[in-house]
């Protein structure tokens, strides 16, 4: 099953081959502008950045790839280990001739962004990250909020194929849960959810959570992250998030030279809810790091 790529006025679309992945890339703004690499999360795709893509801030070239196996990108040649995905996206930067970028990430795109930041800090001028835990966690910080993971992640990791392809789970539960003011609009939720009826996309999402629960969380508990970030990080966080507690992005536990945390009256899907604020913070980061 397939779905049409949702239209966004004025964008350029291409397919770029990198590290065995056929990336679907959507971009806008001047081709010689300062590059901004924007990474989406689950259960979404590049369309979450439609506001920035339709009206890129002056001087910025906004580049929003679909992550491996998501959206309209080809499948990942692995089981979605986040370090593998980080390497895939770094290879995409190489293929597109992007030496340094401003990085933007939300949800799993935020997680992958942190892996990239720590692996190759010289390639990033700054990082705007939204509603994702920073990587400097310990069992003490995670355990009080582990129940949040158990509320949905085991289901996606185990029966995610059927759940995403054959039920309204994404629209009604993931996008429709919580206070009405913070829910994704039904029409927008449908644009995201329809793509996850494709078996490649549903499998990629299932692998995302299965690998996280079975491999990456146990590994992180045994070997906590010790690398320090030298890249300026600006964490924007919707405080009504059910999936990720804001304490997991606390500046007090961030091992970073320059890290700020901004609470926002929004839910998990802060880009959909507050595109104006995301745009403003990107412009501020670009000016700050020029």
Language-model region placement:
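Short amphipathic alpha-helix adjacent to the substrate-entry channel of hydrolases
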Residues: 47-61
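Flexible "cap/lid" subdomain of the alpha/beta-hydrolase fold that forms the substrate-access gate
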Residues: 2-14, 21-23, 28-30, 35, ...
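Structural cue for short, hydrophobic secondary-structure segments
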Residues: 38-41, 64
